[in-house]
């Protein structure tokens, strides 16, 4: 049922930002690339080319994108450009990569050395941004023989983990304001208040992706495997006992109105299964598999129009002013954000998790045969 859902979703696909380059489409693109790696005979790469083709000009210009916006979110979709560059090199893919890498060379940094989340969010580091920017920088550094960029990305990731870790919960805050200037930031620590599941999902995926990219030796020296294992152990413990999914405000099951959120659950499923495949802990496979199966059986269903969609996906959440809203980072705030079936972030993450289940099964079959 799940591959059929993906194909029907792609057939009715609408760009997240009217065709402008953005991370939301990038989540789906990343999912398609991973699906192609496991099922090269399928339509996934053709669909990716159909969707991304109109967004990348012959000169590498990206639709609606400007470097000087300094939005770290815009970097994420660039990861798929490395995938497209490998089997069929095209100058425009490489030129587009350079446009995005050029942003990072000039992107503002906090006083501590981390990328600002966005130009309009000065001195702020969000967990979301760790996934949006740092794996791309590592892939760029590895493919362009720039070990300095790999080391810088690893230093940023470890520094962000140090800054956002909350010892009392064993989790990480959604964001830190190093300037201690934002209303949502604790005046002493600079941290936001509540633990939003999808923010932790972005982080979990960043940790396993980076660990996989840099290889066992460098991963061991970076300390990331231990940090990933500690986080995923805590995440696995917070899964709801019956469904195996995770709550929007992940550590507050008693909170009225809290609900099982699909995008974060798919991200955790992906991260847990990949962690097991990478050798970070065999115990992570079972909760990852359970979560994906639960998403497939309980969150993929038809609405009144008869179309099967991924349900219970939080459309967006953030911190600080956004239009007329003041997003204060409280548990109540995260529960106030609307749900959007088939949101790109949810379906993209589900594609990643489904592909990872295939990758993990293939790896296990190879081990059994050896």
Short names for language-model regions:
Residues 9-19, 160-163, 169-177, 182-192, ...:
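His/Met- and acidic-residue-enriched segments that coordinate or traffic transition-metal cofactors
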Residues 1-17, 46-63, 95-114, 147-173, ...:
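Long, well-ordered core segments of solenoidal/helical folds
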Residues 128-143:
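Acidic/serine-rich, low-complexity amphipathic helices located in mid- to C-terminal regulatory regions
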Residues 204-253, 257:
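Oxyanion-binding "anion nests"
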Residues 1-26, 33-34, 38, 43-45, ...:
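CBM-like carbohydrate-recognition segments
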Residues 39, 88, 140-151, 210-222, ...:
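Inter-helical turn/loop segments and adjacent helix faces that build the functional surface
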Residues 114-121, 175-180, 246-254:
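Short linear capping/connector segments at secondary-structure termini
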């Amino acid at each position: 049922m799940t591959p059929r859902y993906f194909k029907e979703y792609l057939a009715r696909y609408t760009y997240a930002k009217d065709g402008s380059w953005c991370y939301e489409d990038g989540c789906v693109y990343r999912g398609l690339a991973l699906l192609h790696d496991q099922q090269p005979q399928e339509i996934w790469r053709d669909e990716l080319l159909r969707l991304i083709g109109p967004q990348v000009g012959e000169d590498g210009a990206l639709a609606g994108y400007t470097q000087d916006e300094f939005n770290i979110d815009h970097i994420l979709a660039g990861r798929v450009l490395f995938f497209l560059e490998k089997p069929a090199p095209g100058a425009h893919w490489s030129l587009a990569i350079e446009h995005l890498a050029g942003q990072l060379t000039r992107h503002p940094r906090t006083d501590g050395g981390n990328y600002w989340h966005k130009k309009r969010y000065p001195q702020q580091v969000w967990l979301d941004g760790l996934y949006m920017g740092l794996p791309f920088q590592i892939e760029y550094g590895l493919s362009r023989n720039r070990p300095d960029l790999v080391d810088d990305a690893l230093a940023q990731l470890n520094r962000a983990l140090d800054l956002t870790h909350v010892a009392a919960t064993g989790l990480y805050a959604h964001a830190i304001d190093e300037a201690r200037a934002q209303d949502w930031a604790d005046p002493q620590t600079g941290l936001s208040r509540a633990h939003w599941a999808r923010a932790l999902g972005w982080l979990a995926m960043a940790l396993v992706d980076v660990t996989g990219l840099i290889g066992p030796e460098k991963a061991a020296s970076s300390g990331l495997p231990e940090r990933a294992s500690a986080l995923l152990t805590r995440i696995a413990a917070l899964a709801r006992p019956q469904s195996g999914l995770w709550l929007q405000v992940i550590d507050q099951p008693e909170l009225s109105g809290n609900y099982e959120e699909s995008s974060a659950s798919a991200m955790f499923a992906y991260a847990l299964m990949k962690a097991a495949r990478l050798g970070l802990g065999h115990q992570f496979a079972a909760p990852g598999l359970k979560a994906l199966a639960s998403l497939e059986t309980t969150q993929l269903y038809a609405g009144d129009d008869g179309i099967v969609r991924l349900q219970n996906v939080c459309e967006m959440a953030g911190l600080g002013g956004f239009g007329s809203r003041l997003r204060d980072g409280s548990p109540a705030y995260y529960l106030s954000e609307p749900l959007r079936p088939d949101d790109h972030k949810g379906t993209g993450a589900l594609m990643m998790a489904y592909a990872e289940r295939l990758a993990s099964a293939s790896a296990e079959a190879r081990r059994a045969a050896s």
